[in-house]
Amino acid sequence: MTIALSANTPRVSYTVSQGATQTAFTVNFEFFDDADLNFYVDGTKKTLTTHYTVSGGNGSTGTINTTSGNSVTGASGGSTVVITRDIALARVTDFPSSGAFQVATLNTELDRFTAIASDICLLYTSPSPRDGLLSRMPSSA
């Protein structure tokens, strides 16, 4: 899989109409781990496993499902759901200095860095909610 930075917007929003209830939300951009996603309802960030679960990932798209008792019911005038990707800035693979070259692992690592670059672009080009990214960048030690 290859992530095309120009074709990848790591943010999607949904409007749940007044009185309607929705429990599943499509994540139409690639992510790797459940913790890569932020889920907001009317501007309030929800907690993974407490308010929602994630299916998919591993470099693919997926779905966020609300947990029991946490479905999104449209408030007066509707409710807004926003899903963003926020991949922790970290190198997760270490390649040995000898042995077989691991092309698939290298491609996954490069896809992660491309996704991180896309997340940073989103930080500067989209309205809130977008918390998390700057607070997770490593300090200069």
Where are these regions (language model features)?
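N-terminal assembly/attachment segments of tailed bacteriophage virion structural proteins
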Residues: 1-110
